[in-house]
Amino acid sequence: MSDQSNSRLIYGFHAVLAKLRHDPEGIFEIYTDAQRNDARARDLLRHAEQLGARVIPSEGERLDKMVGTRRHQGVVARVDSRRKELKLPDVLDGLTEPALLLVLDGIQDPHNLGACLRVADAAGAHAVIAPKDKAVGLNATAVKVASGAADTVPYITVTNLARALREMQEAGVWVLGAAGEAERSIYTVDQKGPTAWVLGAEGDGLRRLTRETCDELVRIPMYGTVESLNVSVASGLCLFEARRQRSMA
């Protein structure tokens, strides 16, 4: 029986399969909808069996109650919540290419956090950094939306975001803050060297101290009538522009 006090729930095929592939030892048990026998369910069960994970066939209603939603796709896993506390130097010291980091300032919506993790994975970002307080944590909803990226992208939480940004600067990382009123655009600022993109919550933007700590504020050009983008969309534009520039270097 797993230690409930040291566990959290993740759900959805992408999230559970990613956990099986990257950290099978961190899985206590997997609950599956006993009525599902399609190819995706069989594939997950095969992976679980190969890795020796404990599988508990369950009623769909039980899964609904466990996670508080019916959008679990018939698979829920109880995993070890005692993740190794990664520090920024742990990531930076092991890099063989210029750093590409995503920093989230005060994101409150778990859907946005999950989407940002997914974008960071797709763009090959080396870590996502966020404050421990006044921001959403890595809960089951964020993990599901991340579609497995929560177990592939290092997620680092810090007690003082401004201090963390200064640590990045001391390590040679150029810290760029996304701000709509900035003069330079993401297409004119050089991102070929070690770069950290800092994005704030949709609507509120970057906090004052965060803005003041950034090396430079940069805007995403807007050509239509809307004034802002969802933070995950903005993250994708910034990170992939960095990748585009680096591919041309």
Question: What are these model-derived regions, one by one?
Answer:
Residues 1-91:
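N-terminal positively charged helical leader segments and presequences
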Residues 17, 121-122, 143-149, 208-249:
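Structured adenosyl-cofactor binding patch, chiefly the S-adenosyl-L-methionine
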Residues 18, 22-25, 32, 36, ...:
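RNA substrate-binding interface of SAM-dependent RNA methyltransferases
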Residues 35-36, 61, 133-135, 202-204, ...:
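Short, acidic/turn-prone active-site loops that include or flank metal/cofactor-
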Residues 61-66, 83-85, 161-165, 184, ...:
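A short acidic, often aromatic-flanked loop/helix-cap motif at beta-alpha or helix-coil junctions
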Residues 66-80, 146-149, 154-158, 191-200:
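Short basic, glycine-rich beta-strand/loop surfaces that mediate nucleic-acid
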Residues 176-232:
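Active-site/ligand-binding-proximal alpha/beta "capping" segment
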